[in-house]
Amino acid sequence: MFDCIDTQMMQNALALARLGRFSTSPNPRVGCVIAHGSQIVGQGFHVKAGEPHAEVHALRQAGEMARGATAYVTLEPCSHYGRTPPCAEALIGSGVSRVVAAMTDPNPLVAGKGLAMLEAAGIRTESGLLETEARELNRGFLSRIERGRPFVRVKCAASLDGKTALADGRSYWITGEAARADVQTLRAESCAVLTGIGTVLADNPRLNVRAFPTLRQPARIVLDSKLQTPLGSHMISDDLSPTVIVTAVDDEERLKPYRAFNHIRILRSSENAAGRIDLAALLPQLAELGYGEIMVEAGATLTSAFIESGLADEIVLYQAPKILGEGRSLLTLPANPAVLTSEGEWESRSVELIGQDVKWVLRKK
């Protein structure tokens, strides 16, 4: 079905798709290679929503050389008119003879229709080449479409003994400069960075990408059930990225000062029995806003709530070679004796040394 050249061309397409990992949201990351055998005549990737898709960039580069070629694309070509014309039509018009997709597009607007349109035009189509890699690349987009909620990554940083601060609350950078720079990359890949009102009041964070230039800043989401976010905080006064204030408050007079800021969006959500934002109810709301990949950067209470509720899909833990002793713990979870005699619900995906700190990535089994 697929030979070594097919595999190499799709690997090239996936590498191209990764170039858009900081900018395509809410669209998927897609790369395309057009080739005659091992000779590449055109290639491209989707850069930003509203701009040409990967196939169009590749076809423009290939020109007349696209005729009779094979197009390798990491996601099924679209078949509908959105902010851009259908890529399937562009491929048909180019004269390519074969299209290989890493995976079909689960978006109901496409969902096999793109490949069907190509086949109806006499173009041979195949799919499933390096599908696992393609799905991993678009885990956020796929989570939003298939599960109706974002992929949730929880970022943590702690000392070797699992502490985030001293007992009196004093804290500074737990991890080193290299690890903090790596966090900037995770932020840039995310559609949004989510935190709680406790972190806003204690630290007044910006939660934006500062380490390198990027075409878009991730949105910022603050869970603030009682509407306590100070109007002078960076979340409100800094308009570098859109900010969503999630609250249960329904008093328009209290909401009015926040609505005066163009980059602020008020999202009404329900509370749970503890008087905090109901996370399970919130995630589908965030998916409706187009957020597919969310990174949680919060204190122990909110971080623990995502993990305990089963809503965290990935944990990224940065652990520093420091021992704080008595202090504030990374998590506040109830005892779970079952894990002593079982494998647990998390599995290690990677362990990496970044500077002097260890980065540990875990995924839900």
Give, region by region, the residue ranges found by the protein language model.
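Enzymes that bind and transform nitrogen-containing heteroaromatic metabolites
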Residues: 2-20, 25-27, 43, 83, ...
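Solvent-exposed, charged/polar functional surfaces in cytosolic regulatory/catalytic domains
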Residues: 16-19, 61, 140
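Proteins enriched for Cys/Gly/acidic motifs involved in redox and nucleic-acid/cofactor modification
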Residues: 22-26, 115, 129-159
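N-terminal glycine-rich anion-binding loops that anchor highly charged ligand groups
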Residues: 23-39
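Extracytoplasmic/periplasmic beta-strand context in beta-sandwich domains
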Residues: 28-32, 69, 205
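Short, compositionally biased "basic patch" segments
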Residues: 32-33, 57-62, 148-151, 155-157, ...
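Zn2+-dependent cytidine deaminase-like catalytic core
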Residues: 34-133, 219, 239, 244, ...
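Active-site beta-strand termini and strand-to-loop segments that position acidic
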Residues: 36, 146-147, 363-365
